[in-house]
Regions:
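Structural core segment of the AMP-binding/adenylate-forming
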Residues: 87-165, 176, 277
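AMP-binding/adenylate-forming catalytic core of the ANL superfamily
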Residues: 99, 105, 116-120, 391, ...
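Conserved ANL (AMP-binding/adenylate-forming) active-site segment centered on the GW(Y/F)…HTG consensus within
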Residues: 321, 351-355, 393-422, 439-440, ...
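Conserved beta-loop-beta connector loops within the AMP-binding
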Residues: 364-389, 429-430, 492-496, 531
Length: 550
């Protein structure tokens, strides 16, 4: 028997229309580095999104399902594209500006982007790629920047504001099947070519609902959200859509992602919640420790992308009164997989054991742990296996190209359709996930597993260590052993023996690294994670000055 409920499609245009009308006075605030940030109300964003849709459709001929690329920072114009492009029936394709040029060109060509919106400050990045992007017919420049490098390009160059000027501020948004594609984001491609994840209107909508729940980020009207995580990375973790839905204003940092301007914009604009990878927050914490700022407005910072060192969580809370919330997700999970809030009634030191985990899964995300023989493991907090997930905002395949079939590689999807995350961890009986490592980063030493993440977190708790990465390197006797790569804090001079002794207070002796090296900075991927494949290559090529301790 079918229900008597209405079947209304859950689409991005509904988020746009709702935010622009019900929450029309909320603002998208773009930091400019000048005395006053740039402000646009949600109502203005709605009108300009309609103008953008008219420009793309009427002037540039963008059709249904066509991918439109954006090479942009987090700013109000990017928000207009976020909402306007999917609402008109096209597909928003955010381009990761931190990818190597050859990968960026591959992605644009694979998606067959014909129109690319680019911030003027990013023209030096796009211009050299254009000769390798034969299908790009239109480049729309957003904001100031030297356009000379675009002279002579095969693509027509347009000015964003001129393109929008005089166009209708209302667009008759089409009724779209909620299962249709709304946005496209490619993984960072640390192994092989990047893989495209196509988000549906429905997945973005229900993901936004989840982001706004109390068990996630609890956004509401009156909040100001600061997505430091880029809009080109997994939809800025869903904050733009969720904020527009809830009526929470948005503080967009544009290109000002360094610790000092972040601290200044927090003190000036007063956001209530922020989201970024650990390396961003580590820099901000050091800035706040060095120079006192009024950041009492910031009740929560969300940390994801890689494991959050407990020392970072305690530093924010104990020295600045800012609560850190640990979360886990990936491009394929939209990205909200789980968020770490302690159970009700838990306080004091007991809560830290829960907050250090990746958290619990919401009702819409199912999870299981799979052992080395393919068996499902119990949720007992001890059995470690590869995490697999499924749910309404979890990818079931990768984009195979405009004429290609969806891709379901066996190493990424199980025979029964679950996403194989590549993360190894445990789950407690009450559902708290603790990730011990990436499957490819676990150090397999003498038949035992050593967690690189655990060693890194303990090392970064030492006051003389700013960053630490641990990777597996070949060992004749044990197969693999850990190599500790550290970045020393400014002015700190701890020796390797001291760091090893400090680590020895936290882990078993057989887990302690014998090989140590100090570097100016740990190489990072395009989304701010430690790039361990680079460290392994540097070690193999003899590029690291390694000290051997016995």
């Amino acid at each position: 028997m079918l229900s008597t409920m209405q079947d209304v499609p859950l689409t991005v245009s509904r988020i746009l229309t709702h935010g622009a009308t019900v929450h029309g006075d909320a603002q998208v605030i773009t930091w400019t580095g000048e005395a006053e940030p740039h402000r646009r109300t949600f109502a203005e964003i709605g009108r300009r999104a309609a103008q953008l849709a008219h420009a793309l459709h009427d002037e540039l001929g963008v059709a249904t399902d066509e991918r439109v690329g954006t090479l942009m920072w987090n700013n109000s114009e990017h928000m207009e594209a976020y909402l306007g492009i999917p609402s008109m029936g096209a597909v928003l394709h955010t381009l990761n500006l931190r990818l190597p040029p050859e990968q960026l060109a591959w992605i644009v060509n694979h998606a067959e982007d014909r129109v690319v919106l680019v911030n003027g400050t990013l023209i030096p990045l796009l211009a050299p790629l254009l000769p390798h992007l034969p299908k790009v017919a239109h480049v729309v420049v957003v904001g100031p920047g030297d356009r000379a490098p675009l002279a002579g390009a095969h693509a027509r160059v347009h000015d964003y504001e001129e393109l929008l000027a005089g166009r209708p501020e209302h667009y008759d948004w089409p009724e779209i099947d909620e299962r249709e594609a709304a946005a496209l984001c490619y993984t960072s491609g640390t192994t092989g070519e990047p893989k495209g994840v196509l988000y549906s209107h429905r997945s973005l909508y229900v993901h936004s609902l989840q982001v706004n729940t109390a068990e996630a980020f609890a956004l509401a009207a009156g909040d100001v959200a600061l997505p430091v995580v880029p809009m080109f990375h997994v939809n800025a973790w869903g904050l733009p859509h969720a904020s527009f839905m809830a009526g929470a204003s948005l503080l967009m940092p544009d290109r000002f992602l360094q610790p000092a301007p972040l601290a200044e914009m927090i003190e000036t604009v007063r956001p209530t919640i922020g989201a970024a990878v650990p390396t961003i927050w580590q820099g901000l914490l050091a800035e706040l420790d060095a120079r006192k700022r009024d950041v009492a407005c910031l009740r929560t910072v969300v940390i994801g992308g890689s494991a959050c060192p407990p020392a970072l969580m305690r530093g924010f809370e104990e020295r600045h009164g800012i609560r850190v919330v640990h979360a886990w997700g990936m491009t394929e999970t939209s990205p909200l997989g789980c968020v770490s809030h302690p159970p009700a009634g838990v306080s004091g030191e007991e809560q830290w054991a829960y907050r250090a985990t990746q958290g619990r899964f919401p009702a819409s995300v199912e999870a299981r742990l799979i052992g080395p023989a393919g068996e499902e493991l119990p949720w007992d907090g001890a059995a470690a296996g590869e995490l697999e997930v499924r749910g309404p905002w979890i990818a079931g395949a990768y984009y195979g190209g405009a004429q290609g079939e969806a891709l379901r590689p066996e190493d990424k999807f199980s025979p029964d359709g679950w996403l194989r995350t590549g993360d190894v961890g445990t789950i407690t009986p009450d559902g708290y996930l603790t990730l011990t490592d990436r499957a490819k980063d676990v150090i397999k030493s003498g038949g035992e597993w050593i967690s690189s993440v655990e060693l890194e977190n303990h090392l970064m708790a030492h006051p003389g260590v700013a960053e630490a990465a641990v990777v597996a390197v070949p060992d004749e006797k044990w197969g693999e052993r850990p190599l500790a790569v550290v970045v020393l804090a400014d002015g700190a001079t701890p020796g390797y023996e001291e760091l090893r002794a400090f680590l020895g207070e936290q882990v078993a002796r057989w887990q302690l690294p014998e090989r140590w090296t100090a570097v100016p900075s740990v190489p990072k991927t395009s989304v701010g994670k430690f790039d361990k494949k680079v460290l392994r290559r540097q070690y193999a090529d003899g590029e690291l000055d390694v000290t051997l301790l016995r």
